[in-house]
């Protein structure tokens, strides 16, 4: 289903580009917007792995790491 939506969006973008290319007055800003939309469509088509920066941490791991910061700083001050 998602791939069908992506293909439909790509077809619409291609058709709109053909219409605007006929006019030959795409401004720099419009080209930038089209490029950004195409990049977003590709990121969505690649799936959730495109949005992940690194390994997932559980909420408890995040909380423990945040709560452990003062202890680490306190231990560093004793040295």
UniProtKB/Swiss-Prot annotation:
Residues 1-22 form the signal peptide. The gene is PDH1. The modification Alanine amide is found at residue 76. One of its GO terms (cellular component) is synapse. It is found in: Secreted. Its main location: secreted. One of its GO terms (molecular function) is hormone activity. One of its GO terms (biological process) is response to light stimulus. Coiled coil: none annotated. It comes from Penaeus vannamei (Whiteleg shrimp). It comes from the Eukaryota. Keywords: Amidation, Cleavage on pair of basic residues, Hormone, Neurotransmitter, Secreted, Signal. The pigment-dispersing hormone causes the migration of the distal retinal pigment into the proximal end of the pigment chromatophore cells and thus decreases the amount of light entering the retinulas. May also function as a neurotransmitter and/or neuromodulator. Eyestalk. The function of PDH precursor-related peptide is unknown. The sequence is not well-conserved among different species and that might be an indication that it is inactive. Pfam families: Pigment_DH. This is Pigment-dispersing hormone type 1. Belongs to the arthropod PDH family.
